[in-house]
């Protein structure tokens, strides 16, 4: 750290997200960014592109992130709030360069992904590291501190409880008491799910744990303990590659066949109503339920709920003051601020290779790369802002 930058100081917040097309002309270039390096045929991209075109070729995610950024500016007056994406403008590389040019020294990074996985956590650390590595040599390298995972924070859980209760009220009265709570999240290849977290299988275990906590919260409001289900959506890739199951549409059909009277579909794995919610749940899953006569309602996402926005401020304060108590509602406890080098390593990359990559980055003086990959604070090195 420098003499002018006190320990724990944070002088900006970076909102980090996936990105999405702003209009029809953006759809295919965006999808090419998402699938870069995977040799996905154009015919498959065209199929997915049609889903976006159903909504005017514009992802709802962007406007929702703009709204979240504005809410965060109101919640954190005096702290500049920036926004950067992995796959579309504003790109992280451009935003981090803007921050560095503005003199930002240490920024907290809030990623709109609550759970452990390569694509939902570690890959964002890699994206941040790449953005630092791409900075022009004339710019000092800011320190980027990714905020901890928030899947079991009350600021995420409590709004989801309220949204489940509201969705139950949308069901026909005779279906409300015995309705199932069908929690959903983005499916992952089994190999990636098994590698999630420091000891493996963190992604499905976190989802299950917080689903039970939310269901208990619903019970406190309604007096009814609803059956809890966990299903997945948005599967892609070759059919021969196993992914997390069951599919949400398949599970709705199974529930109807088993005599269920209704279900609330809860988009637990998403913080806003982006395309996976708008298409995979509101169109595909709803169609499957209608085909078998199962009444369903879809719970809302947290969006810009004031409790969720206040949670981000609380996570920033945890970085500013590591001695603050950290709130969490599952047996996982508050997720660590730092991730181990072997956490969420993609199956194609061994833990030894990942650790060596982090070590090599640190040895070359690229402090930002190592800090982001491992999730470390890096202030103890006394090398903040160095670039060699």
Curated annotation (Swiss-Prot):
> Per UniProt, which keywords does this protein have?
Cytoplasm, Heme biosynthesis, Iron, Lyase, Metal-binding, Porphyrin biosynthesis
Q: Which GO terms describe its molecular function?
A: ferrochelatase activity; metal ion binding
- One short Pfam name that applies is Ferrochelatase
Query: What is the reaction catalyzed?
Result: Fe-coproporphyrin III + 2 H(+) = coproporphyrin III + Fe(2+)
Q: Which residues bind Fe-coproporphyrin III?
A: 59, 124
Answer whether the UniProt record assigns the keyword rRNA-binding to this protein.
no
Q: What name does this protein carry?
A: Coproporphyrin III ferrochelatase
Source organism of the structure: Frankia alni (strain DSM 45986 / CECT 9034 / ACN14a)
